[in-house]
């Protein structure tokens, strides 16, 4: 018997590191995008938790009226938030070393900018990591394309909108009630409910939820039973099996009779592509809408669009919405010297035909 011994080529530490980073045998795939994602998301998460619990009030409007957002300063889980960076900072990058002290950095809302920028980098890297793992496994790249929709939405509200409005103070606060406040103010200032792209996003999200529920219930109701009546049908499924796990013909026939013939898919690939496409395109369109409204290309305006023969306005729902928008905008302005543009831009109404003479 002949035994051949070959000298094992020595690999450098860097090569072993590269092999470990890109290995698909790890329990959790890291990848080169993961090298960026992990520190960014850890930083964003850590600072968010600390700021949500203990950050001091922030002068969000830059008018020396700090707003409290943390739990230790009187808030609860519902009202708490990481308050956006001060309007006094605007769009300037505001790392800790740009402030004169840590107290100043906290007062001006530095944690918000730190969390948002690291979070956006992290989720973008997560999307790239999805593509990277798909590539290494020989899969198609549609998973990261689908995830691009929430990435686009987050980028729109946390980065594009502040850029368009000229200050990070206009970004969405990182909290529950802060999110609702952002939505109300956005409606008041941009009439988003009357924007076609927002309507498409609503159809995408709610339609996607409806289609998902319909698909899941149809599949669950048409499983191919491989077990006896006394056992769960789930025991008849083996991970990775080549056979179909449900009868798409039965599901197609059921749904075709429930609605009409052409309302159902008879091709599983086309069906699942549609299920992925519908909500993704809707959220893409909403993100584009937010990004255009960031630069004040607002929703449609049908205010006072109907008048009678005497020129009197006949109010429609558009006028009701406009009245609500004005009320929200007035309540939003905490600084009494800052009137909403809708109220401040009206032409002056004369109160006298001529000025009275004043005897000196």
UniProtKB/Swiss-Prot annotation:
Signal peptide: none
Main location: plastid
Family listed: Belongs to the reaction center PufL/M/PsbA/D family.
Residues that hold chlorophyll a ChlzD1 according to the record: 118
Keywords for this protein: Calcium, Chlorophyll, Chloroplast, Chromophore, Electron transport, Herbicide resistance, Iron, Magnesium, Manganese, Membrane, Metal-binding, Oxidoreductase, Photosynthesis, Photosystem II, Plastid, Thylakoid, Transmembrane, Transmembrane helix, Transport
Sequence positions that bind a quinone: 215, 264-265
EC class of the enzyme, as a word: oxidoreductase
Protein name: Photosystem II protein D1
Chain ranges passing through the membrane: 29-46, 118-133, 142-156, 197-218, 274-288
Catalytic activities: 2 a plastoquinone + 4 hnu + 2 H2O = 2 a plastoquinol + O2
Propeptide: 345-360
Residues annotated for [CaMn4O5] cluster binding in this entry: 170, 189, 332-333, 342, 344
Cofactor note: The D1/D2 heterodimer binds P680, chlorophylls that are the primary electron donor of PSII, and subsequent electron acceptors. It shares a non-heme iron and each subunit binds pheophytin, quinone, additional chlorophylls, carotenoids and lipids. D1 provides most of the ligands for the Mn4-Ca-O5 cluster of the oxygen-evolving complex (OEC). There is also a Cl(-1) ion associated with D1 and D2, which is required for oxygen evolution. The PSII complex binds additional chlorophylls, carotenoids and specific lipids.
Xref: HAMAP family: PSII_PsbA_D1
Site keyed Stabilizes free radical intermediate: positions: 190
Amino-acid positions noted as binding pheophytin a in the UniProt annotation, renumbered to this chain: 126
Marked site (Tyrosine radical intermediate) residue numbers: 161
Topological type in the membrane: Multi-pass membrane protein
Subcellular location: Plastid, Chloroplast thylakoid membrane
Role played: Photosystem II (PSII) is a light-driven water:plastoquinone oxidoreductase that uses light energy to abstract electrons from H(2)O, generating O(2) and a proton gradient subsequently used for ATP formation. It consists of a core antenna complex that captures photons, and an electron transfer chain that converts photonic excitation into a charge separation. The D1/D2 (PsbA/PsbD) reaction center heterodimer binds P680, the primary electron donor of PSII as well as several subsequent electron acceptors.
Note: 2 of the reaction center chlorophylls (ChlD1 and ChlD2) are entirely coordinated by water. Herbicides such as atrazine, BNT, diuron or ioxynil bind in the Q(B) binding site and block subsequent electron transfer.
Gene field: psbA
Single Gene Ontology BP annotation: photosynthetic electron transport in photosystem II
Top-rank taxon, per record: Eukaryota
GO cellular component, one term: photosystem II
EC number from the UniProt entry: 1.10.3.9
């Amino acid at each position: 018997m002949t035994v051949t011994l070959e000298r094992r080529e020595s690999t450098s530490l860097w090569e072993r590191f590269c092999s470990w980073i890109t290995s698909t045998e790890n329990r959790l795939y890291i990848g080169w995008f993961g090298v960026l994602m992990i520190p960014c998301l850890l930083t964003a998460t850590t600072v968010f938790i600390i700021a949500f619990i203990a950050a001091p009030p922030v002068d969000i409007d830059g008018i020396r009226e700090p707003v409290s957002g943390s739990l230790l300063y009187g808030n609860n889980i519902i009202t708490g938030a990481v308050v956006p960076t001060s309007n006094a900072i605007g769009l300037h990058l505001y790392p800790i070393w740009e402030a004169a002290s840590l107290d100043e950095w906290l007062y001006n809302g530095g944690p918000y900018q730190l969390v948002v920028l690291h979070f956006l980098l992290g989720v973008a890297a997560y999307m790239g990591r999805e593509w990277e793992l798909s590539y290494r496994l020989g899969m198609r790249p549609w998973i990261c394309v689908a995830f691009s929709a929430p990435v686009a939405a987050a980028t729109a509200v946390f980065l594009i909108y502040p850029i368009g409005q000229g200050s990070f103070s206009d970004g969405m606060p990182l909290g529950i009630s802060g999110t609702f406040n952002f939505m109300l103010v956005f409606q008041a200032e941009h009439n988003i409910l009357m924007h076609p792209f927002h309507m498409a996003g609503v159809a995408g999200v709610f339609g996607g939820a409806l289609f998902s529920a319909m698909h899941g219930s149809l599949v669950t109701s048409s499983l191919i039973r491989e077990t006896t009546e006394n056992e769960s049908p789930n025991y008849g499924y083996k991970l990775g099996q080549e056979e179909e796990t449900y009868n798409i013909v039965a599901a197609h026939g059921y749904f075709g009779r429930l609605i009409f013939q052409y309302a159902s898919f008879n091709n599983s690939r086309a069906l699942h592509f549609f299920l992925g496409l519908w909500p993704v395109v809707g959220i893409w369109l909403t993100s584009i809408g937010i990004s255009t409204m960031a630069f004040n290309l607002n929703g449609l305006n049908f205010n006072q669009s109907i008048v009678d023969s005497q020129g009197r306005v006949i109010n429609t729902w558009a006028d009701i919405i406009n009245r609500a928008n004005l009320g929200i905008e007035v309540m939003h302005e905490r600084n009494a010297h800052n009137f909403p543009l809708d109220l401040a831009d009206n032409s002056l109404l004369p109160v006298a035909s001529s000025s009275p003479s004043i005897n000196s």
